[in-house]
Amino acid sequence: MIETIPTKPYEGQRPGTSGLRKKVTVFEQPNYVENFVQATMDVVEPSAKGAHLVVGGDGRYFNFHAIQVIAAIAAGNGVEKIIVGTNGYLSTPAASHIIRKYKLTGGIILTASHNAGGPKNDFGIKYNLGNGGPAPESVTEKIYSITKTISEYKMVKIPPLDLTTTGVRRYGPLTVEVIDPVKDYVQLMKEIFDFDLIRSFLSKNPDFTFVFDALHGITGPYGEALFCKELGMPSSVCQNCKPLPDFGGGHPDPNLTYAKSLVARVDRDNIVMGAASDGDGDRNMIYGANAFVTPSDSVAIIAHHAELIPYFRDGGVHGFARSMPTSGAIDRVGKYKGKNVYEVPTGWKFFCNLFDAKRLSICGEESFGTGSDHIREKDGVWGILCWLNILAGLNAQNPKIKTLIDVKKDFYNIYGRTFYSRYDYEELENEAAGKVMDRMRAIADDKSKVGEAVLPGFVVSEAGDFEYHDPIDGSESKHQGLYIKFENGSRIVTRLSGTGSSGATLRLYMEKHESDSSKFDLDAQVALKPVVHAALEILALEELTGRKEPTVIT
C-alpha cells in the first residue's frame, strides 16, 4: 500500500557537478534522504510510474541503508523495477553501461566519488538519465527547486532487500533484480580492447611488471576480473581490491598524495606500470617507475594512439575534448590529426551532449578522469586498459617500446611537452578563498591588462572568466573558471571546487608548453617554477590564506 508521509524541506539540497554530496551525518537526519529521492522521482522522464532504474554505489558507509530507502520510495512512486548489484555494489561506469545496455529509464548512483568514506565522512546521491550520463543542470535545478518546497513523499513499506545473491525478487509492487555488478562491464571491455594482443605482449615481455591499486574502492572486483582472470596476470598485481565502507581509512583519490600505497609499491619494486582507481571507479592514475603520467598527457596520448584500440579503429574517431583547466596537450593532437577539440567546463555532463551528437569520441579532465563515447561517464578502468592496449600495440610494431617512459618520449618528440601542475588548497575559509579569486578576477575582468607585463617575463596575452556555449543545445554555462594566458606560452587557471562537503577548495592550475627536447626530462615542478612563482605572487596566496603549501600537488 502506498503511504504519503508529511515532511519539511531541508536547506542546501542542491546537487553539484556530480550529485548531492554531504557528510553522512547530514544524510542521517530524519527524512533527508527521503526528501531528495522523492524530488528525484518527480523529475524522472517521462515518469517514475513504470520506470526501470539501476541503483547501486561504491560500497561506502550508508550505501545499504540508502538503497533500502530508494527502493521504498521508488515503489511508492510507481517504479516498476530496479536493478541492483550484489551487496549494492556498482561502479559508476558500470551503472552508465547498464542503463544504456538494458535501455533503462535512468539510474541512482550512490557515491561521493574520491571523497573519504565512513560515519564521519562523505556520502552522495546522483541521478543519471536514460543516455547513461549525469543529469544536466536543467534537471538538477528542477530537483533542487522541488526540495525547497517539498511537503510529502510517497513510499511503500517493504521488507529489507536481500542483495547477497543474484536473482529476481518481488517486494510488494516492486521488482528487484540483483545482478553480478562486474559481468556486463567486463564483456564491454572485451569488445573495446584487444585482449589477445595484451596477453601476447605480457607473455613476450616477462620483465613487464604491473600493479593495480583499487584503494579499497569499488573497482577491486572489476580489476581482479579483468587483469587476473581475463589477462592472466597473477593475483599479486591487485592490491587493496576489497571494497570497504571507509576505504580502509584512506582517501580513495588516485593522485600522488592519496594513492601512496601505489606509489610506494611502484617505487619499491620498480614496477613498469602502476595504476590506481578511485572510490566509484571513474578516475585513474597511471604511474610507473620514474614515469608519472599526468591526466592531461594521458588523454592526449590515448587520443594520439586511438587507432591501436579496436573500438576506435573500427568505429572511427569523431573528435576530442577536454575540460577548460586541462592542459592544451590534446589540442595539439587534434590539430595534427585534423580533429575538432572542444573545450568545456569541468563536469562530465558537458561532454555527454557532444557524445550523443557524435561530435566526440575521446575526452578527459585534469582531475584524473578519462573516457570515451562507450558510456556517458568517465571510466577509470577503461583508461588503464587503454594504456595496456597502447603499450601492446606499440610493442608489436617496435619491440623496443615496452615502458611508460618509451611511450611518453615518443609523444613528446612529436608534440613537445606541456608541463602541468595543479595545486589544491582544501578546506579554506570561504572568505579567504574569495579574496584570492578576487585578485585573479581583477586581471581577468580588466581588458587593459592584455599586453601588460604583470610580472617580469609574464605579459598577458588573454584573460577572462570561462563561459561555455553548448554547440548542441545552445545552453550557456558562465563563471566556469578564471584564466590568464601569457605570451611566453604559459597559462594559469583558478577555480573554486563544488565537490567538497565542507569548506572551500581552491584549485590553481599551471602549465607551460616546451618544444626544446633537451628540457623534456625536467621534473614538472622545476620546469614550472617561474610559472608557479608568478601565480603565487599574482594571487597573494600565502598572504590571504596563511597557507605556505598546498594540500595536494599534482
Curated annotation (Swiss-Prot):
Sites binding Mg(2+) sit at 113, 278, 280, 282
The catalytic residues are: 113
What Pfam families does this protein's entry cite?
A: PGM1_C_vert_fung, PGM_PMM_I, PGM_PMM_II, PGM_PMM_III
Instruction: Provide the GO biological process annotations.
Output: carbohydrate metabolic process; galactose catabolic process; glucose 6-phosphate metabolic process; glucose metabolic process; trehalose biosynthetic process; UDP-alpha-D-glucose metabolic process
Protein's job: Catalyzes the reversible isomerization of alpha-D-glucose 1-phosphate to alpha-D-glucose 6-phosphate. The mechanism proceeds via the intermediate compound alpha-D-glucose 1,6-bisphosphate. Key enzyme in hexose metabolism. The reverse reaction is an essential step for biosynthesis because glucose 1-phosphate is the starting point for the synthesis of UDP-glucose, which acts as a precursor for the synthesis of oligosaccharides and trehalose.
Where in this protein does the record say Phosphoserine is found?
113
Q: Tell me where in this chain the PTM Phosphothreonine is found.
A: 111
Q: How is the cofactor bound?
A: Binds 1 Mg(2+) ion per subunit.
Q: Does the keyword Isomerase apply?
A: yes
Q: Where in the cell is it found?
A: Cytoplasm; Nucleus
Write out the catalysed reaction: alpha-D-glucose 1-phosphate = alpha-D-glucose 6-phosphate; O-phospho-L-seryl-[protein] + alpha-D-glucose 1-phosphate = alpha-D-glucose 1,6-bisphosphate + L-seryl-[protein]; alpha-D-glucose 1,6-bisphosphate + L-seryl-[protein] = O-phospho-L-seryl-[protein] + alpha-D-glucose 6-phosphate
SUPFAM superfamilies assigned: Phosphoglucomutase, C-terminal domain, Phosphoglucomutase, first 3 domains
Q: What is this protein called?
A: Phosphoglucomutase
Q: Which family does it belong to?
A: Belongs to the phosphohexose mutase family.
Q: Name one GO molecular function term.
A: phosphoglucomutase activity
Q: How does it assemble?
A: Monomer.
Identify the cofactor(s). Answer: Mg(2+)
* EC id: 5.4.2.2
Per UniProt, the keywords (alphabetical) are:
Carbohydrate metabolism, Cytoplasm, Glucose metabolism, Isomerase, Magnesium, Metal-binding, Nucleus, Phosphoprotein
Q: Gene Ontology terms, cellular component aspect?
A: cytosol; nucleus
The domain of life is Eukaryota
Under CDD domains, the record lists: PGM1
Q: Does the keyword Phosphoprotein apply?
A: yes
Q: Which residues bind alpha-D-glucose 1,6-bisphosphate?
A: 21, 113, 282-283, 346, 365, 367, 378
